[in-house]
Amino acid sequence: MSDNANAIDPNETTATRRQRGERIAAELSGDPNPALLATLDRDFPFLANALTSYAVGEVLARTVLDVRARQLALVAAFAALGFGNEFKIHGGYALNAGVTEDELKEIVYLITIPAGFPRAIQASQALAELLASRRAA
């Protein structure tokens, strides 16, 4: 499959991508107005626009991978990079998309190979926080 099979129309406006990004963010989070985007929009509108129009409205809008696979890939990447906050955000999205707690724990185990134990321990702590907050809700 070529990269162009899933490409976003280059003539599409940033506003169109942002609208799509806002819709996808709401679907992923299960919240029609995700708090992260609202805070960014208020305090750092340029970041909110970049995140919503490009990262979500373009990259996450692609359909070569389904939502579940895409979120597993992102969770693994964020865990390996040591980005605990992003791991928790996308871990929540992954759970919303049908990924199980055991699958997220397996990601933590798997990243010991490319990223080492310190990053896996960071990810395990982030996952424990995520799961505790979801159970408390």
Go through each PLM region and give its residues.
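A short structural micro-motif
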Residues: 79-80, 97, 110-117
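A cross-kingdom feature marking solvent-exposed beta-strand/loop segments within repeated
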Residues: 90-97, 102-109, 130
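A general alpha-helix detector
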Residues: 24, 55, 72, 89-90, ...
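Acidic, glycine/proline-rich low-complexity segments that act as flexible tails and inter-domain linkers
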Residues: 1-67, 96, 121-137
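Short, structured motif recognition centered on aromatic/hydrophobic residues
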Residues: 70-78, 107-111
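Substrate/cofactor-recognition hotspot
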Residues: 71, 86, 110, 117-121
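Short acidic alpha-helix initiation/capping motifs at coil-to-helix transition points
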Residues: 49-52, 81-88
